[in-house]
Amino acid sequence: VKDKKIVCNDFHLKDPERIIVVTGPNQGGKTTFARMFGQLHYLASLGLEVPGTKAQLKIPDRIFTHFEREENVETLYGKLQSDLLRMKEILDNATKDSIVIINEFLSSTSLRDAILIGKQILEILTKLDCFGVWVTFIDEFSSYSEKTVSMVSTVDPADPVKRTFKIVRKPSDGLAYAIHIAEKYGLTYETLKERIKS
């Protein structure tokens, strides 16, 4: 695409770090980062070159992914139950040599339940000692233990509506920047109130 710059992202894990927890604003490149992590490990496991200036990657026995799926009306399971069953299958089969990639898991339940369930899953993953990425809106996961690392999707400091698509290693800041998106589309409380009046 003309005039579009490729955004390069780096990551590293140092012992005992195992799980990269990616937080930050919507549409900031978090899911693309998770896919990139999986693709790098997949290409390396095939013995192929990987995109990047330098890479030292673990060759996994398996790569497990948990990305959002549409609800299957034939199973009669709700979204949360379906997600939990898929996660159980991953946890039952993953080993210390596996890669686990989780994207926006637990978005279909309350924040309190999501934190509770998520911490139990992090407990299992860190005990397994496998490597992985977890993209989430739950900042608490990024500081769960010495085995978790926080990376954050960044925005342009001059204009928080603009995403940089740069994912950097830093503590989660708890900012979703949703109000800026609402302002961009004229969906603030004030503008909606004015529309209702007129």
Model-derived segments and spans:
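ATPase nucleotide-binding head domains, primarily ABC-like/P-loop NTPase cores
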Residues: 1-198
